[in-house]
Amino acid sequence: MSTSAQAAAATPKVEISDLHKFFGELHVLRGIDLIVPPGSVTVLIGPSGSGKSTLLRCINELESIDAGRVKVDGELIGMREVERGGRTELHALSDKARAAQRAKIGMVFQRFNLFPHMTALENVMEAPILVKKTPKAKARERGIELLERVGLGDRLEHYPSQLSGGQQQRVAIARALAMDPELMLFDEPTSALDPELVGEVLQVMQDLAASGMTMVVVTHEMGFAREVGDQLIFMDGGVICESGDPVEVLDNPQAERTRAFLSSVL
């Protein structure tokens, strides 16, 4: 392996260092440190209000951070380092540079947020055309490919109101993939679905993980965490209480707060 290849392999996909986030006086994230290796699936679990979703939103700068650093592929998110007078200063990136960073990170939300006046295919085509200036014919070809990938090749011209919740969420995943992200973030993607529709979305996510996509997933689906996750992070009160191999954490949690949480959900 070449030196450059070794360096690339050693670079975490996501590196979070001493991350703090406040909402007013509420200290939501309290010094988070986290490494997400390339091609891995990191699953975040914990009670409501523990900071899981806020952490996700800080990774792609939907929320600004108050202290600490977030790097994706070794590149600071939202900031650049400037050497001045023997010390390193952090300066905010331009809006254009921040948008370019954000375009590399796909995110799927609890609510599908599809455009109701657009078909499934049009929803998937929209961002590549507007943001990446992809020719319409190429965006359409890619959109069809992605909708077929998530099992919706027969729903291209359906509007969101004509789709089930699970189908809408699969369109949302295809829409995120249309930007060719290097990292995918999922914020409780199945929590708004009827129980019988959860499996179809989890299957798409499992297939995506098998393809080598780096994923950070907030979920209450412990079966998914066990079967697909490479590392499991339990958060409570804005801190990481426990982390490790999903099977080990789920079957033999070491922290009392982890044990209490798992006993309430398993």
Q: Which ranges hold each PLM region?
A:
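Short, low-complexity, intrinsically disordered N-terminal peptides in bacterial proteins
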Residues: 1-10
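C-terminal boundary and immediately downstream tail of ABC-type ATPase nucleotide-binding domains
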Residues: 2, 234-237, 243, 247-266
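ABC family nucleotide-binding domain
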Residues: 9-246
